[in-house]
């Protein structure tokens, strides 16, 4: 009977201990429920006498009651939520930094090109020689054909007139050369004066054809011995 009372009291104590709530901190804590192993030893002595004949014998019985209680740890929900939110929150490195605003570079000051000298303009690769020769060739080709048609003399006869022919040639060459050099020495270009069909490229090609025409005219008259207009 005493054993039952002891067990009942132990069970009541254990039940009340199990029902009592464990107050745990709300944030960043772990709820720990720990119980120990309890061993209950109950000794009971029983005196037995069979029919009163045999001497009484004492029987001692021992009741061992072992209660194994386990320890387990339960994480707090708030701390678990904080851990989850901390793991899912973006790191500062994931934020894209705004690209720096590019400041446009200041325009370089336009330096005025120096005017070429006479020797630069009259150089073999300069702008003056081919253009001046082309203009003189165009004027000479038209003048040679006009004189042949008017007087009947060939190109070689016209060059042989040292008094009038050579004077006209030198005067025409001087005027056209000076008129072509002055704009170049002032820094102007022929391309800046081009408009429509009066372009710099057209003038170059016409001058080249005129130079070839003068050479062909002189060669033809020398071979045939007669002016080109009479052939």
UniProtKB/Swiss-Prot annotation:
Entry annotated with the keyword DNA-binding: no
Biased composition (Low complexity): 83-109
FT transit peptide: 1-31
Protein topology in the membrane: Multi-pass membrane protein
Major localisation: plastid
Keyword annotations: Chloroplast, Membrane, Plastid, Transit peptide, Transmembrane, Transmembrane helix
Location of the protein in the cell: Plastid, Chloroplast membrane
InterPro entries according to UniProt: Chloroa_b-bind (IPR022796)
Keyword field contains Transmembrane: yes
A GO term from the CC aspect: chloroplast membrane
Sequence intervals crossing the membrane: 165-185, 209-229
Region: Disordered, residue numbers: 81-111
Domain of life: Eukaryota
Pfam families, A to Z: Chloroa_b-bind
Induction: By light.
Task of the protein: Probably involved in the integration of pigments into the mature pigment-protein complexes.
Family note: Belongs to the ELIP/psbS family.
Protein name, as recorded: High molecular mass early light-inducible protein HV58, chloroplastic
């Amino acid at each position: 009977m005493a054993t039952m009372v002891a067990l009942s009291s132990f069970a009541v104590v254990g039940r009340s201990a199990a029902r009592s709530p464990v107050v745990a901190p709300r944030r960043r804590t772990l709820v720990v429920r720990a119980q120990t192993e309890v061993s209950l030893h109950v000794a009971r002595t029983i005196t037995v006498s069979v029919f009163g004949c045999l001497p009484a014998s004492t029987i001692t019985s021992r009741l061992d009651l072992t209660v194994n209680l386990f320890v387990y740890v339960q994480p707090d929900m708030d701390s678990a939520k904080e851990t989850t939110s901390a793991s899912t929150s973006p790191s500062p490195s994931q934020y894209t930094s705004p690209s720096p605003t590019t400041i446009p570079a200041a325009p370089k000051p336009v330096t005025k090109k120096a005017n070429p000298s006479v020797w630069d303009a009259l150089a073999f690769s300069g702008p003056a020689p081919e253009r001046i020769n082309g203009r003189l060739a165009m004027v000479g080709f038209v003048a040679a054909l006009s004189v042949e048609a008017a007087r009947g003399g060939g190109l070689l006869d016209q060059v042989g007139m040292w008094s009038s022919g050579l004077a006209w040639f030198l005067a025409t060459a001087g005027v056209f050369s000076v008129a072509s050099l002055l704009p170049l020495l002032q820094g102007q270009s022929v391309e800046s004066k081009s408009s429509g069909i009066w372009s710099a490229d057209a003038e170059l090609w016409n001058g080249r054809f005129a130079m070839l025409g003068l050479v062909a005219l002189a060669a033809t008259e020398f071979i045939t011995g007669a002016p080109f207009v009479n052939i």
